[in-house]
Amino acid sequence: AMRKKSGYCRGGRGIRAYGCRHAPTGTKIQFIFIKAEQQMKEASRVQAVIEALEEILQDKRPADNILDKYFKDRRYIGSKDRRFIADTVWKIIRSRMKYSEALGSAFSARTAAALCFAQEDLDLLFNGEEYAPAPLSKEEKAALKAAEQFEDFSEAALYECPQWLFEKIGNTRLLDALNTTAPADVRANLTDRNHARERLKKEGLFFSPTPFSPIGLRSEDRVNLNNCMTYQDGEIEVMDEASQLISLLCRIKAHHKIIDYCAGAGGKALAFGSLLHNDGLIWAHDINEERLGRIKKRAERLDILNIKTIKNVQDKDYTRFIIDAPCSGSGTWRRTPDAKFRITPQRLREILGIQAEILEFGAEHTAAGGRLIYITCSVLPEENERQIESFLAKHPEFSPIDHKELWRETLDIPLYPFDDTRWLKFSPLNTKTDGFFFCAMKKAVAES
């Protein structure tokens, strides 16, 4: 059960605005506080939140992986309790910087959870009984009282972005959009999306066509596809609309020699296979063989038969050399809000070097007249346009194609929601998608 209260956010800064995004002074908002149902049951839920949150704060692994393992190791936790625990953990993660600044040196999984439940009787929740959190100390209670009144948030905390990344991105509207919750996007696989949509509807799952992608469906609701037969039968695959569009914009044909060079678990390679209806051949390469090994299992479910994995890339005549480059992942913060705390300045420098090396390799292995395609799921300029500008300065044989023309000939959509024709920058602002960068460059044919 939930209890809602209305109130005003003091300058958009009050600690009680944690359940919402930054709002200007005087903006009416809805606070959502968690109402206890049965106190002992609720206390054990709070303890579970603390345990899961502690692991996330201490571990470098993605939060969703940690939560999955937490619940897998505790199969006795029911579905409603799992959802409650996961929702609370994600709520805290999405406002981690505000919690941290408000609590100061007292910030911990315990105090963050207590602050999240501050509208409840904390002495009943933190009662020290079996499966319940230990009682709050005087110091913790004092810190919580101060945190509830705290308003002096840094601008970076208001937009939930580490200071060094806040300075790089700068665009507060974009950061605000990256703090929202992403919809559930899927693409049709080897079928018409209307057919997939009707089948989903029969299973009680309601999707609408995506606004740009002709193969996509979207639900604004939380969707669990684990027991969905449409998904299990391979008629749909989870894929953000921007990623779907990028797959289409690669303009692959069955006669092309295609390589998905940083294939990972094969998301784009599998989309290519579907677009070609199993005609032609797609080579998939990744330095992480474990990730690459997942492609086979995914391809079996999707009935994709035209993908082959490759360890060593030697041929230099690829007509589509596609680089889905390793990156900061800053464009996916709507789905992975913890990722912003795992990236460091040093790691970003390493990634930039890797991206440049991969571009050099791709340039060497792209056929004359072919396209070298560079993709990231980042919104950081140094990973995107600056990386391309640096590459083009050293490689006059490559030139960006006209992306406005590419967009219109691929999608037959008059609206062009981008500011540049040299590349495409998808974001929750302009395309209502994750943040992606796409640049297709053509390699000149040597004059005879």
Regions found by a protein language model. Name each.
Residues 27-448:
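S-adenosylmethionine
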